[in-house]
Amino acid sequence: MKLKRIAALLTAAVMSVGVMASCGGSKSDDKSKADTKSAAETSGAEGDSSESEEIPVSQTHTNDPMTVTSAKDLVAKMSNGWNLGNTMDATGEGLESEISWLPTKVYTNKFMIDMLPEAGFNVLRIPVSWGNHLIDNNYTIDPAWMDRVQEIVNYGIDDGMYVILNTHHEEWYMPKPSEKDGDIEELKAIWSQIADRFKGYDEHLIFEGLNEPRLRGEGAEWTGTSEAREIINEYEKAFVETVRASGGNNGDRCLMITGYAASSGYNNLSAIELPEDSDKLIISVHAYLPYSFALDTKGTDKYDPEDTAIPTLFESLNELFISRDIPVIVGEFGSMNKDNIDDRVKCLDDYLGNAAKYDIPCVWWDNYARIGNGENFGLLNRQEYDWYFPKLMDVFKKYAESDPSAAAA
């Protein structure tokens, strides 16, 4: 691993030589710039693979053969997942927004993504915020932003991973009657462009229509109302119809559907109404449990194995969906670093163990944050190409190796 890390750093340095020369950078800046630049930063002027140098990213994967499969069968091939958090979902403008929320300004590159399968992950979720990258009143997505998103999608696809692409911090949707029609118009406009760009990809690419849709800033923001839940069901219907009408492989693509706030609460889960479709829909839920241990910055740093939050979640998911042959993916989970690695290991083992009973893949939220008093979910050291917490990685590998169907994918 050490040799591979050194090779990755050297190759990254070689890739950025042309960029630095054109910008007049000094030799003393070489190492830091090599560590923080990716080829895509130059909007295709430099590529980080021979393929991207020869073929524009927009012309890749235009006609991949599609293996038509049910969502249940597809999810059965998944093991552990990893979120590229606080990256493409940052809410700034321009290509620089990719690094605006990161503690060290490291652009995503192929070497990072190559580390995931080796560590026991075969699912890559790429949260993307699109609203600040629209260039006109017709909701046209900035072509440079679309290209950069596609480049990162290709990193995972070319590694044989299952890639989940979503709309993330979209401040423009608010599930209220007064906002509904405008929200659906924008939702359809954005997803029609995403679906068209990626319609040639095979079943390894999954679309997730919404991320934690909720009444932002209101008293019921995280609990929801019956009215808001119904409107979100309408949003999801519009998402599915838009993708299905876009042609290519999208008629058979598996899609992820979320309820209010992607909540794991029973009331919100039970209010999900799946749009009329084939057997290619997957439920998406987010669950940082037990809350006081996993997500509350002022909560406990001790994990109580007698806490029932985790088993109760998976029992509810089984009752509402799995038992009805509707697959589920936990699209976000994790426990933040409170200098309590042994307790985090126990929690992760319990979480993945309960999920495995029902063949539910879980996707860790990695926001590249590790120290301080905030939400520190970082696992991958994106600058040094190693893992911050090897004991946690051992747990992921344990469950990846115990899932022969996922390993065979």
Curated annotation (Swiss-Prot):
Keywords: Carbohydrate metabolism, Cellulose degradation, Glycosidase, Hydrolase, Polysaccharide degradation, Signal. Residues 23-66 are annotated as: Disordered. It is an enzyme of class 3 (hydrolase). Residues 57-66 have a biased composition (Polar residues). One of its GO terms (biological process) is cellulose catabolic process. It comes from the Bacteria. This is Endoglucanase B. It comes from Ruminococcus albus. The gene is celB.
